Amino acid sequence: MNSKMSEELKIPKDRVAVLIGEKGSTKRKIQKLTNTKITVSSKEGDVLIEGEDNYRIFVTGNIVRAIGRGFNPNIALKLLKEDYALDMIGINEFSGKSKKQEERIKSRAIGTDGKARRTLEKMTNTNICI
């Protein structure tokens, strides 16, 4: 029995163009690699992912979330590998409600010219987007 499953999510409007790619190339590539259908509302940033396999929809959702949070699509596509995962940590969990504290934490995590972030990525074998 073939039954369609779906997931709806929202990404920032300024990341919609990155998700779609030049002439739709990024979206097509994701759809082909995951065997899903992605529908994007450019005005609102709403994304609908449809398919017949829950796991593929889950992985596609993580790829879309990663792109929406600032990752390059080629890095986000690494999530297709079973030993890769997406983990999002809210800086406000550590900064409280203070915008100054949030900016300070972001600055420390990035470092001068991104050196701290690059060092963290190398030491932990991860990709980090702040």
Give residue ranges: language-model regions.
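RNA-contacting regions in translation and RNA-metabolism proteins
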Residues: 1-130
